[in-house]
Amino acid sequence: MKSIDQVNLGEKDRQAIDEAVQLLYQSFSIEQIILYGSKARGMDDTESDIDLLLLTSEELDWKGRNAITDALYDIQLTHGVVISTLVLPIHEWTQGRYTVLPIHDEIERYGVAA
């Protein structure tokens, strides 16, 4: 898997991702963060969002997911970006139902370790 330094990102996207990654690792039980979607593939345009897969050590309820969304709000406003998150326990990503979905293949192929 490529690292974030190997991806051609605009400055505001890079800053937003760096801040989001730091905040998420410090504030939540995140095991791994992966950039995916058009930005990871290098096919983004001015309307593209930042897609982040957040793999957690445990299942998060709706309150935990909302806390992540709320925590990212200021970063989105500051940098003028939209950050979309897919939050999953790491065991579901590696062994659960997601292993057979097309999004799993896409992220395994094009995902970028953030």
List the model feature ranges, each with a label:
Residues D51-L55:
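Short beta-strand->loop micro-motif that forms the acidic, two-metal-ion catalytic signature
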